[in-house]
């Protein structure tokens, strides 16, 4: 199993991390939501964690409203209107956080390879083709669900903003050929299921 471990240890933006900002190329605009507001950066990891031998980095963004911190829960579905973004890019450029500086500094994410079998109903944060759905299975045309992140792990990675995804699981859908796409570019989206 490729397990994702979220640590409280502070991280550099050039390393795999949750929270904080990220190093987007200077010619790439920060993702915005349907109202034009900057999205919250959730995490950045190497593409090789998902597709062995591939180059580049993946950064994950979600709409987030500081006044109503649960508003984004209802919008992150496989239906139309989902404004979340996964970007494929080189991990270079100017450090930015899209205006969410005060929420949480960057914290370490590690990939742990284990011999532990992947169980269908296990909600461990992981990179996998074997996904445990909290509710019903979701599908996004032209994409495959390649990763799931337990909401409790975001409470570690985004310690300054607890509850961003409490009581649920974030599912990462990437385009089936994402690792061959030109960088930088949009290559996926997030969905969220909660109990």
Locate each region found by the language model.
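Preference for intrinsically disordered or flexible, low-complexity segments
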Residues: 1-195
